[in-house]
């Protein structure tokens, strides 16, 4: 990696009341494996934050779980509340409760993840301007792309939601110091036609941890395997595969 310049990766890969809190997908809940009893204290934990109109039960979260399970990595993947005024307190409390070693985000999740300071974070195609995007995309009912734990099938984008995103976005990048710059990585698809905040990331975090990969906005298995997982393993100090 050349410091001070983006890395281009080529290859084959193209606080809410308790009753109101969304379910959290904890992908560590599997039968214990033989010989693992003494590893409990060394388990690593990832908090995965999904994109807009998605859920914790999406392909990237599931793949992280499957690929890292053998390394005793827990993946906590919440269904983020659709309203930003509810989502941010919910996520701050979740971080306090779960104490993740690493936060990995996709799209809208990067907006929230940027503000969860003090923890190493990987922001993949972060959507830092949700208010503007939703304003131009139009308001109305949207269907969730993935299964939600509460059974919800759709939700409404309205002026209140957009205003809440706009207020939240005012807090972006505040107080970013050298320590925060060292903790945060930005991964950007070279062919992302939906969202591209490379310049914003570089302005506030520099280019040392800015990675440009051969891909689009939505992640696929090849990109997760070739780009995301190697970085996650490195940051968690796991054996390279």
Where are these regions (language model features)?
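Short hydrophobic targeting helices and cationic amphipathic motifs
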Residues: 13-16, 27
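Gly/Ala-rich beta-loop-alpha elbow adjacent to hydrolase catalytic centers
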Residues: 104-113
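Short, Lys/Arg-enriched N-terminal segments with co-localized hydrophobic residues
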Residues: 26-42
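Active-site catalytic motif of lipid deacylating hydrolases and related acyltransferases
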Residues: 44-97, 216-217
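The alpha/beta-hydrolase serine catalytic core
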Residues: 120-241
């Amino acid at each position: 990696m050349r410091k001070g310049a983006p890395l281009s990766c080529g290859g084959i890969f193209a606080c809410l009341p308790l009753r109101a809190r969304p379910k959290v997908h904890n992908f560590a809940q599997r039968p214990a494996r033989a010989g693992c009893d003494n590893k409990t204290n060394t388990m690593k934990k990832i908090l995965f934050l999904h994109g807009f109109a998605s859920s914790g039960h999406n392909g990237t979260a599931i793949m992280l779980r499957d690929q890292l399970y053998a390394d005793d990595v827990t993946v906590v993947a919440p269904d983020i509340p659709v309203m930003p005024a509810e989502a941010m307190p919910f996520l701050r409390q979740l971080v306090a409760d779960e104490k993740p070693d690493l936060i990995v985000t996709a799209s809208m999740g990067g907006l929230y993840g940027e503000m969860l300071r003090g923890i190493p974070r990987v922001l993949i195609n972060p959507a830092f301007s949700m208010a503007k995007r939703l304003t131009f995309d139009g308001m109305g009912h949207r269907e969730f792309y993935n299964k939600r734990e509460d059974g919800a099938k759709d939700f409404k984008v309205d002026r209140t939601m957009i205003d809440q995103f706009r207020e939240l976005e005012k807090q972006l990048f505040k107080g970013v110091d050298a320590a925060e710059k060292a903790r945060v990585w930005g991964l950007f698809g070279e062919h992302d036609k939906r969202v591209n905040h490379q310049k914003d990331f570089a302005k506030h975090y520099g280019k040392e941890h800015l990675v440009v990969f051969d891909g689009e906005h939505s992640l696929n298995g090849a990109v997760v395997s070739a780009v995301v997982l190697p970085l996650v393993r490195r940051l968690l100090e796991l054996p390279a595969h």
